């Protein structure tokens, strides 16, 4: 997982489903050093172990010209320094994978998966990626070149991977999240002062 909930929270329902099918399976979460979410009780109750490694990210700002990128000295310096974090994280991940000897690596994306993917490649551990968005993230595109299988939230045509390696699985959703019918939608809209037949757009 990465440093945001978008990469991490889908891991919980997946982990619970795996535990339900095989209570003896051992699940290890490798996250970014310094993140707070993995210490939550919800994580501690489903993962057998949690570990943290260093990693760096490649900062890029869509819509800017190449000249703007070249003149953005601060970003260039930060990207250069973060390369060393990726290298350090790769050594840390290599040691962790040697210690725990996992059967498979599941990559949900986020820049922390790059060192783990590199270490898994060196240790010849199979990798499975999952992309929730219609566009694969940079980290999964990097790790994806070594992956055996790509699970996706959207149809295969949206992804750059070999088509025979893609399975559209949808997005893991917590079992406590239930579908909402139109009647309940109308009721909830009235509660917050919206017309029951009005269109509501949620931006997160």
What is each model feature region?
Residues 1-8, 105-107:
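Short, glycine-rich nucleotide/cofactor-binding loops
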Residues 1-4, 19-82, 169-172:
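Conserved nucleotide-sugar phosphate-binding/catalytic loop shared by glycosyltransferases and other
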Residues 19, 44-46, 91-106, 113-128, ...:
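Glycosyltransferases and closely related glycan-assembly transferases
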């Amino acid at each position: 997982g990465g440093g945001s909930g978008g990469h991490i929270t889908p891991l919980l329902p997946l982990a619970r489903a795996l535990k339900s099918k095989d209570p003896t399976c051992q699940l290890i979460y490798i996250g970014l050093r310094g993140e707070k979410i993995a210490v939550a009780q919800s994580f501690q109750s489903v993962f057998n172990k949690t570990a943290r490694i260093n990693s760096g990210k490649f900062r890029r700002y869509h819509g800017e010209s190449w000249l703007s990128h070249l003149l953005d000295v601060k970003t260039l310096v930060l990207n250069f320094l973060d390369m060393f974090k990726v290298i350090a994280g790769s050594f840390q991940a290599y040691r962790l994978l040697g210690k725990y000897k996992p059967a498979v690596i599941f990559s949900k994306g986020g820049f922390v998966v790059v060192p783990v993917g590199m270490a898994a490649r060196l240790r010849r551990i199979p990798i499975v990626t999952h992309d929730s968005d219609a566009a694969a993230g940079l980290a999964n595109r990097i790790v994806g070149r070594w992956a055996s299988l790509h699970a996706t939230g959207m149809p295969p045509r949206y992804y750059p991977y070999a088509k025979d390696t893609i399975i559209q699985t949808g997005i893991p959703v917590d079992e406590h999240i239930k579908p909402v019918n139109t009647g309940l939608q109308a009721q909830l809209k009235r509660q917050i002062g919206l017309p029951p037949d009005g269109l509501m757009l949620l931006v997160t």
